[in-house]
Regions:
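Residues that form generic nucleotide/phosphate-binding pockets
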Residues: 15, 30, 51
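Enriched for short, Lys/Arg-rich terminal
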Residues: 1-6, 10-14, 18, 57-89
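A short, surface-exposed loop/turn module that caps and links secondary-structure elements
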Residues: 33-57
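Compact soluble domain cores
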Residues: 23-37
Length: 89
């Protein structure tokens, strides 16, 4: 099984840098799991609806999420990272 190729939006990178070091470590751990299996039950990966239709999200922990989309050639683009507030458009 090949690992998922991940690209990062400028917005995602900015948000990631603002996270606490502890949350950054949790996010990196979740990303490693995501690369191996984007639909691991530990990540609670789910489709988004409404204004975020076409995007997906997975859980870093109980409170924090990553919003992403599947792109060409089996890759994904990480759009946002943070608490549930990232769902607000």
């Amino acid at each position: 099984m090949t690992s998922v190729q991940i690209k990062y939006s400028a917005n995602f990178v900015r948000q990631f840098k603002k996270l606490s070091p502890q949350l950054q470590k949790q996010a990196i751990k979740a990303e490693k799991l995501f690369k191996k299996d984007p639909f691991s039950s530990k990540l609670k990966t789910h489709k988004l609806t409404g204004k975020l239709n076409g995007l997906w999200a997975f859980a870093i922990n109980y409170k924090d999420r990553v919003i992403f989309e599947f792109i060409e050639k089996g890759g994904v683009l990480f759009h946002k990272i943070g608490s549930h507030d990232i769902y607000k458009v």
